[in-house]
């Protein structure tokens, strides 16, 4: 597959990742140059969060009371997929959940589906 095959701004790349309790969370991005905006819900575990590259997606997840981080456009290129997507204007969402939070991660994926289907905007 050629890399150019994914350079379509109407298609999203969704990454799914797990973390360990307290090691990596939405709080990790407070006062961090990689984050343009951070929203942490008072009712959600900060270990379960989204990383997005587009402001409308940040607003969508915030409006749905989900922990969400908007990656900064000036974030250093560390070779990550999110940086690649942002530089190439490919919408990107990382669904990050604590290991063992399978139910929460499934709910997060359903919220992604809602975003992608245009429902709830």
Regions found by a protein language model. Give the residues of each.
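Structured catalytic-domain cores with a bias toward divalent-metal coordination
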Residues: 1-121
